């Protein structure tokens, strides 16, 4: 059985690795796209919006609802990518906890 000191060292090591993975994730950028790529939203791994780009074809002053819907779709797409990558990157730590 592991003694308490070894468990603490292992936990500290895992914490440092997890913090490094979180920093790497935050530095990554994810691009979400709406249908037909008419709206693209770029977010960082820590879910901050970097940019939202609109194809001129989607900008219709008479139909702002479609533009709004496509913007939401693009942002949600990027958020899904972030969540999937987060699970892959940080989920591995769950099985390594010493307790």
UniProtKB/Swiss-Prot annotation:
Pfam family, one: YbaB_DNA_bd
Keyword vocabulary terms for this entry: Cytoplasm, DNA-binding
Organism superkingdom: Bacteria
Cellular component, GO, one term: bacterial nucleoid
Main localization of the protein described in the UniProt heading: cytoplasm
Intracellular or extracellular location(s): Cytoplasm, Nucleoid
TM region(s), chain numbering: none
SUPFAM superfamilies, A to Z: YbaB-like
Alphabetized GO MF terms: DNA binding
Subunit-level organization: Homodimer.
Family to which this protein belongs: Belongs to the YbaB/EbfC family.
Function of the molecule: Binds to DNA and alters its conformation. May be involved in regulation of gene expression, nucleoid organization and DNA protection.
Identification of the protein by name: Nucleoid-associated protein SP_1102
Organism: Streptococcus pneumoniae serotype 4 (strain ATCC BAA-334 / TIGR4)
């Amino acid at each position: 059985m592991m003694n308490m000191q070894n468990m603490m060292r292992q936990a500290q090591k895992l914490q440092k690795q997890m913090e490094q993975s979180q920093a790497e994730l935050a530095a990554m950028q994810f691009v979400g796209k709406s249908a037909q790529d008419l709206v693209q939203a770029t977010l960082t791994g820590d879910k901050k919006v970097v940019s939202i780009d609109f194809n001129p074809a989607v900008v219709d002053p008479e139909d702002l609802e479609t533009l709004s819907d496509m913007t939401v779709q693009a942002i949600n797409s990027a958020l899904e990518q972030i969540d999937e990558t987060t699970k892959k990157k940080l989920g591995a730590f769950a099985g390594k906890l010493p307790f």
